[in-house]
């Protein structure tokens, strides 16, 4: 995205060309899901990048409806294809330690009872990404989002860890793309969607 695009924008602009400073040059995203032995539905996400900036902030937008083609430059009317309850999963990695995973939903006020005060962005107005009080309270933090990591609903990692002998060899192999990934160029996450309240138990 370019031209000052924000997450809540209804008509974001897709640009191509050079990567802006301090931004990740993403090469691949992966997504998978399955049903756990406890009957919960799990979502698995991963990303790869070519540069090693240290920190990484990725968003995975999951929609009910088909979206515009984001592989070509131009203005995209995502406002017409977002639905109440669509998901935005944020993957925030500070350069060391475990990433922080959080979840917001697309709020409109039409069927979800949301008000502008439920928007996650400061000063946001409906429609927006945020969390109604029933969702916001799931992690015990009043911040208009569900902190999946703090609530124990998700776990994630980036390939930057050392083994017990203090020998660091963080390069891993992606068998799908058949490429080796140096330290801090791969991140993954597993999310319990049932525990997070995205799906009711038994659904």
Locate predicted features:
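Surface-exposed extracytoplasmic segments
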Residues: 1-203
